[in-house]
UniProtKB/Swiss-Prot annotation:
InterPro entries: At3g26010-like (IPR055290), At3g26010-like_b-prop (IPR056592), F-box-assoc_interact_dom (IPR017451), F-box-like_dom_sf (IPR036047), F-box_dom (IPR001810), Gal_Oxase/kelch_b-propeller (IPR011043), Kelch-typ_b-propeller (IPR015915). PROSITE patterns: FBOX. It comes from Arabidopsis thaliana. Residues 27-77 form the F-box domain. SMART domains: FBOX. Residues 7-19 have a biased composition (Basic residues). This is F-box protein At5g07610.
């Protein structure tokens, strides 16, 4: 065999690199450049599209789930729109889900939606919803006793974090503003135990602790100089305007804690129309929630009145104003099943509850979602039009007469890529 036939031609370096399973520096640069372009394109897409694109390839999955990318998308699209509501049944720990997405016309309602994680098969109870994240709890049996675990959960990505053990607390609240920080905080209103904080003043019966997702631990923030009776019914909370606000159905005020200034103040709820009216009964409607940066409040003390007032407090304000008036009479004419007779007075009442308030970019597009017997109805504030959104008949056939138009609590669902 000639020498030339034995001579092996040396392959180019880039070819050898590919054949050996590696990439040259120029190839890596090209891939990085392609990723940069792809990230630019993906960042303009809605979150529901990004969720579908996660299944395209492992590379796309890696890009979309990268915390830097997800935080960039969330911040550029804030405030994110409400995509639906979780509805808690008063009879069991199950959640129905009502979708507001236009492409969910034929599947608006999902029934018997359990919330549980792989390491805890017991159902979760939602405590609060804030900008796409849920604060949840569950009771888990361990060594002949029950422990209550608390989680921060992203229902969009199915990610969750177990908070460090919490004991002896009075109230919790979740704070998350992705336009300011990718990290969330959980605030705990706690009473002083006999063997803790012995150096604290006897007047400091309560204090606030904070858990930061970037630190992963609890720390004491500030004492609360107030009387014990202030917190008896403060079992609910809403995060609004950089502050956590605790409230209860038997109180006329909210306890507000500004997370930046660490200032504690009382946020009064709107005054009664008549001073001689009693305080709201827990069985009568009370609704307080945030939407697109503003705070909204609805209270019903007289179910025979056809006028439903919606109060608003803007982010740059400290006072309430009547934003909308809802006339229930045309709604009752179209849906006569919401007219009931109160059994102990024989008076005519309107059977309804509030699922949620949705503020859009314009007042003309904003609406309230009401729950009337067996169905959810969307009511537009400005043009006074309404339409049935979904049917609850399959969910409520076994419910008692006085409960089947009410859900115990509702929670916003916002699609988010936020990391927990």
């Amino acid at each position: 065999m000639s020498s030339c036939s034995r001579t092996r031609t040396k392959a180019p370096r880039s070819a050898r690199s590919r054949r050996n399973g590696g990439f040259s520096s120029s190839s890596a640069t090209i891939v990085a450049d392609i990723d940069d372009v792809l990230i630019q394109i993906l960042s303009f897409l809605p979150i529901k599209t990004l969720l579908r694109f996660k299944r395209v390839s492992k590379r796309w999955l890696s890009l979309i789930t990268n915390p830097v990318f997800s935080n960039r998308v969330i911040k550029s699209n804030h405030p994110l729109p409400i995509s639906g509501f979780f509805l808690h049944s008063p009879r069991e720990i199950k959640y129905s889900f009502v979708s507001l997405d236009d492409d969910a016309t034929n599947q608006r309602i999902s029934s018997s939606l359990p919330l549980w994680f792989t390491d805890h098969q017991t159902d979760m109870i939602i405590m609060q919803s804030t900008n796409g994240l849920l604060l949840c709890k569950c009771s888990c049996a361990s060594s002949n006793h029950f422990n209550t675990n608390y989680y921060v959960y992203n229902p969009t990505t199915k990610q969750y974090t177990l908070l460090h053990q919490i004991a002896g607390h009075i109230a919790l609240s979740l704070a998350f503003d992705p336009s300011r920080s990718p990290h969330y905080k959980v605030f705990c209103l706690r009473g002083r135990s006999n063997n803790s904080f012995s150096s604290a003043s006897d007047s400091e019966l309560y204090h606030i602790e904070v858990y930061s997702s970037n630190e992963g631990l609890w720390r004491r923030v500030v004492p609360v100089p107030t009387s014990p009776s202030t917190f008896i019914e403060f079992s609910y909370s809403v995060f609004w305007n950089g502050a956590v606000n605790w409230y209860g159905f038997s109180s006329r005020d909210c306890l507000s804690f500004d997370i930046n200034t660490q200032e504690i103040k009382i946020l009064p709820l709107p005054d009664h129309e008549h001073e001689d009216e009693p305080l709201p009964d827990p069985r009568i409607l009370m609704f307080l929630d945030e939407s697109q940066g503003n705070l909204y409040y609805i209270e019903v003390n007289n179910q025979s009145s056809s006028n439903l007032r919606v109060y608003e407090m803007e982010s740059n304000s400290s006072s309430w104003s009547v934003k909308y008036n809802v006339d229930l009479e045309p709604l009752a004419a179209a849906f006569p099943e919401m007219i009931r007779t109160e059994y102990y007075t024989d008076r005519r009442i309107y059977a309804f509850s509030v699922i949620g308030f949705v503020k859009e970019e314009t007042d003309a597009a904003s609406y309230i979602l009401l729950h009337i017997p067996n169905q959810a109805v969307k009511y537009n504030f400005i043009d006074k039009t309404f339409k049935k959104l979904c049917d609850f008949k399959s969910l409520v056939n076994d419910a008692p007469e006085d409960h089947f138009y009410r859900f115990q609590r509702t929670f916003q669902f916002i699609k988010s890529l936020a990391n927990v």
